[in-house]
């Protein structure tokens, strides 16, 4: 019943337009798993920074006693998506002078920070010059600001942490690391990471490929709901990431891995290179689900390892 209600709320409340990686449920589960791996000292340091986020009071409102830090950390994972719907936050463009600037809570949405569009041609369609500012370039800047011994102000460290928790999850969604070009989609942006291809899932819903992948874990959620789903039998808490891969904390490597997985799994048959809707096979959906779970678990482990290094 809870999953049905969440699905209904997601349908009613989620805005049309560009997909938001993993949606609330996926981002929250990743943050929850990462938080469980953090040392008490790192949890405290992260919470001290997150308290500077203007949304912190709403994050901890209603949290069970003693779980305020956990709830704040998990809520922070969706903050860069939440601001897209705030009336006092504004769009800017990747070509603007503001594109690369880290301005603490400066009321810009920076929607192009959510992905790294490595360009890929399916049929030798010419490729444009890639954007210089993306998820990888910005996450590297943010990571450099997180240690306490840098010249970054506390508000800047807080802003960087709020974004970093989210972007680690984004970069492990394969379609946030690629833009496929073809004769059917030759214009700037190509397929925009699967936003232009239409697929029909087993439930009969027609949606774009990117939204299908973003919604694998569900849509709208609460912190309680995400924790419940992660910890239930067969939930994300049971997926064990590769220990060696979990030690890799270079965003460029994560993006390259996701790019490769997009080509081999996300764009696998029966997905087309044009806008013609196609029915997904059971094999495709099973492979997508399995890969998404592995990527989310890996993202959680890497986020925890990253924060242990930069917040020690």
Predicted regions and their residues:
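Positively charged n-region of N-terminal signal peptides that target proteins for export
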Residues: 1-4
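Hydrophobic helical h-region of N-terminal Sec-dependent signal peptides
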Residues: 6-14
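N-terminal signal peptide c-region/cleavage motif recognized by signal peptidases
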Residues: 16-18
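N-terminal, motif-rich segments that launch catalysis or mediate targeting to/interaction with membranes
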Residues: 20-167, 174-312
């Amino acid at each position: 019943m809870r999953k049905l209600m969440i699905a209904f709320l997601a349908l009613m409340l989620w805005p049309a337009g560009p997909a938001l990686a993993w949606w609330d449920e996926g981002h929250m589960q990743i943050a929850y798993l990462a938080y469980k791996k953090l040392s008490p000292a790192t949890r405290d340091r992260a919470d001290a920074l997150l308290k500077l986020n203007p949304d912190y009071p709403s994050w901890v409102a209603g949290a069970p006693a003693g779980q305020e830090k956990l709830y704040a950390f998990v809520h922070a994972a969706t903050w860069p998506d939440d601001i897209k719907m705030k009336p006092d936050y504004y769009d800017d463009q990747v070509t603007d002078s503001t594109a690369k600037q880290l301005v603490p809570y400066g009321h810009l949405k920076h929607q192009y920070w959510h992905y790294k569009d490595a360009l890929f041609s399916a049929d030798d369609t010419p490729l444009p010059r890639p954007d210089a500012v993306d998820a990888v370039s910005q996450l590297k800047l943010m990571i450099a600001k997180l240690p306490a011994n840098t010249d970054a102000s506390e508000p800047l460290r807080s802003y960087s942490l709020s974004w970093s928790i989210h972007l680690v999850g984004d970069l492990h969604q394969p379609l946030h690391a690629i833009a496929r070009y073809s004769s059917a989609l030759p214009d700037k942006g190509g397929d925009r990471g699967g936003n232009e291809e239409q697929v029909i899932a087993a439930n009969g819903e027609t949606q774009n490929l990117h939204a299908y992948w973003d919604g694998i874990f569900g849509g709208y959620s609460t912190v309680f709901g995400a924790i419940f789903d992660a910890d239930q039998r067969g939930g994300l808490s049971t997926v064990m990431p590769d220990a060696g891969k979990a030690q890799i904390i270079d965003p460029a490597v994560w993006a390259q891995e996701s790019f490769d997985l997009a080509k081999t799994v996300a764009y696998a048959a029966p997905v087309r290179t044009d806008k013609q809707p196609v029915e997904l096979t059971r094999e495709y959906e099973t492979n997508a689900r399995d890969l998404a779970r592995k990527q989310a678990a890996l993202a959680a482990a890497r986020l925890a390892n990253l924060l242990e290094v930069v917040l020690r």
